[in-house]
Amino acid sequence: DPDNRRNFAEKYSKRFNVEIVPVETPEEVIRGSDVVHCATNTSVPLFDGNLLEPGQHITGMIGSNVQLVKSGYRSSRRREIDDRTAERADLIVCNLRETILTEEPGDLHEPIEKGLINFEDIYELGELGTDLCPGRTSDEQITYHKNTNGNGVADLGIAMRAYELAKDDGRGSWLEFAEPEDLPQEI
């Protein structure tokens, strides 16, 4: 809906003091963007992975609804990203690989089921910057992060930001904890 897009852009441009431009098509968003961040509640992929350009990073935020699908309340898994995006990604990272098996996010589980990508080729967020994950090895690589459950990295970042804002605003209370040497050694 053009009015919703325009109203959203106006409201959040003012709120965050950034320019938000409403567009008509996914192609307009993807073309020339360094980062494509998806945060919806859809069960239909948002764009065709063939539109991706070298060097782009994609993040998919949508959570799983696999239990609703298995119990018959929904006919398909939620997914923002299509199979082609998963295929084209040179590096795929999720928060915790195990959640691909337990939560079955459509964005990754379906391409794995179809044999388009391999579970073993997906890295965990905590592996980035270690010998376990090569990370981006070329500026031309397309990278994809699927925000799955099960990793406190994002929670820690949010908590740190909340702490900084509260501290800057003079809010909150400082709690004293026992020093490690004062704690019982056996539990």
What are the residue ranges of the model-derived segments?
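NAD(P)-binding Rossmann-fold cofactor-contacting core
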Residues: 1-16
